[in-house]
Amino acid sequence: MTQATPSSAPANPSMAALFAPHGALRASINLGNPVLANLDPKTGAPVGVSVDLATELARRLGVPLQLVAVKSAGNSVENIEQDKADIGFFAVDPKRAQEISFTGPYVLIEGFYAVRNDSPITANEQVDKAGITVAVGKGSAYDLFLSRELHQATIVRIPTSPAVVQGFIDQNLSVAAGVKQQLEQDAARVGGMRILPQRFMVIRQAMGVPKARGDAAAAYLAGFVEEMKASGFVAASLAKNGIEGAIVAKAGD
C-alpha cells in the first residue's frame, strides 16, 4: 500500500537529495505495531505517530511523502534493505543496526507476556523452561530479543504481530509475547487470558535511515527526532491518536 502527499519546494535541497533520491520521501510504515500506526476506519489511510513524524520530515525536506505500508516489522526492515523505502520506524536492535542508522528513541514501548487464565505461569522467569512454547511476531523486536534471551523455551514465529494471539490459540501455545496494548485488546476480545504483571523488555522505538545514505543523513534524522521530542510533537501525536502505555523517550534513553 502506498500513499503520496504533495509538499512545497525543497526547503533543504542537500538533505532532500540524501533522503529522497527518487524524488519523494518513501516512509515504511509498520501497521503490525498499533502503537506506531493504524488504518483510519473512515479513510483507510495509515495514521499514527510514525505517519505524523514522516509527514513533518517530508515537510521540512520540502519533498512529497510516499507511505509504504507493511504488516510487520520484518517487512519494514526489508523495505530499507531492498531500497523500497528511504526511512522507517523500528525497534532499536543490534542486528538491524548492521544495515540501518538509528536515531535515539522517540517512544518507549513495554513488552509483556500473556497466558491462559489456567496457566501455571505467573511470572516472567517461569517462561524460559523446557516444553514452553512462546508465540512472537516474526521479525519483531520481541522475536529478536527473545531469540537471544530464551534458551530452554521454544519460540514459535507467527507471520505478523497482530496475529500472535490467534496463533497462540490455534496452535495451543503456552505464552504470547507482544506489545501490551495489542495483548490487552486481544485478551479482551477472545477472553480467558491474562497478562503477566511485569514487562519482560522495554522497546526503544526509533527512526532509521539506510547506512548507505551516509553520516550526514543519519545526523540530520537524529537531530530531527530530538527536536520532535523536545517540542512536544511526539507527545501530542500520541495523545491525538489515543495511544496509551507508550511514553515519550527522554534524551539518553
Explain the meaning of each model-derived region:
Residues 37-41, 54-64, 103, 128-130, ...:
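Ligand-binding cleft/hinge of the Venus flytrap
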